[in-house]
């Protein structure tokens, strides 16, 4: 067991009693090794039942956070994964995720690059097919966020970058993957509670998440006749490296406290939603968004 897996397996009681301190990281999307404590990526006693046996999934942002937990749960269910991560700073986390997937008896391909580049997205699909021969599940999960006190503080560069990473990338990668997705395939997009509630300091980020929700619904309609399902997951406050890489230590210390359950969620509490949407358990579900947010009721 690698050091990065210490304290990353938990039960319901561990989720409820989880304590975190104020902390901050300098660069997004943040890395596991600098977090104290680590997020909980696996559920104690979880046993897969081959729901994704022999399937191949591309998971963006799969090196840490939500994407990492999704990749591990997919491996428990028999899937091989392609993990796409942004830069060299995330390599250690990506390798730890790959190690865990391989411990579970599945294969994992790591690819580093900028998902805001359409050519790179095409290469991701190309390398996936060269390695595994087919593609069954696409999880569009990678994102970035940069809080600002005012709309006037959002530079043109930040606006363009946030939209390119968060929503343009989904268009690019989905377009690249679509010719190779067959009947029964599943596309899962990570949106956010901010798409429904808004966020006064994440105006551009929340706007991209609203766009993702509309993208999900529209694409689901477009692909229904091809029997390819498209759904979304809207996380609430989830404890991932992106949080200390986004907010001040003071805000991180109280992150999640405003949720109805009075705590942040863990990636392991979110990943089973992706398993459901990727598997044949959800064959009559498309165009929907699952809200995993600690009890907040949203209309959408």
Predicted regions and their residues:
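The beta1-alpha1 cofactor-binding region of Rossmann-like NAD(H)/NADP(H)-dependent oxidoreductases
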Residues: 91, 111-125, 156, 268-269
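Catalytic Tyr-X3-Lys loop
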Residues: 136, 152-171, 188, 212, ...
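Short C-terminal tail/terminal secondary-structure segment
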Residues: 3-9, 35, 43-44, 148, ...
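A conserved structural motif in NAD(P)-dependent oxidoreductases
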Residues: 259-270
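Active-site helix of classical SDR
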Residues: 174, 208, 216
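Conserved mid-core segment of classical short-chain dehydrogenase/reductases
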Residues: 14, 19-20, 122, 143-160, ...
């Amino acid at each position: 067991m690698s050091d990065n897996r210490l304290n990353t397996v938990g039960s319901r009681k561990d989720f409820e009693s989880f304590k975190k301190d104020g902390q901050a990281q300098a660069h997004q999307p943040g890395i596991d090794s600098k977090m104290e404590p680590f997020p909980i990526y696996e559920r104690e006693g979880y046993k897969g039942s081959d729901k994704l046996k022999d399937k191949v999934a591309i998971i963006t942002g799969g090196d840490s956070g939500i994407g990492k937990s999704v990749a591990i749960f997919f491996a428990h269910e028999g899937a091989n994964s392609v993990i796409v991560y942004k830069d060299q700073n995330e390599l250690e986390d990506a390798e730890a995720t790959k190690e865990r997937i391989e411990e579970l008896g599945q294969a994992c391909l790591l690819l580093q690059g900028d998902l805001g580049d359409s050519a790179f997205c095409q290469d991701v699909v190309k390398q996936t097919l060269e390695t595994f021969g087919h593609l069954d599940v696409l999880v569009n999960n990678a994102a970035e966020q940069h809080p600002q006190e005012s709309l006037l503080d959002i530079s043109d560069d930040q606006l363009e970058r946030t939209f390119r990473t968060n929503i343009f990338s989904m268009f690019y990668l989905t377009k690249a993957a679509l010719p190779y997705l067959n009947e029964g395939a599943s596309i899962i997009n990570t949106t956010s509670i901010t798409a429904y509630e808004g966020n006064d300091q994440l105006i551009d980020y929340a706007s991209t998440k609203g766009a993702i929700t509309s993208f999900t619904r529209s694409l689901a309609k477009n692909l229904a006749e091809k029997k390819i399902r498209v759904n979304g997951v809207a996380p609430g406050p989830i404890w991932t490296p992106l949080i200390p890489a986004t907010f001040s230590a003071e805000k991180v210390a109280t992150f999640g406290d405003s949720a109805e359950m009075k705590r942040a969620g863990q990636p392991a509490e979110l990943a089973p939603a992706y398993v459901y949407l990727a598997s044949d358990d959800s064959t009559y579900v498309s165009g929907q968004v699952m809200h995993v947010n600690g009890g907040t009721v949203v209309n959408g």
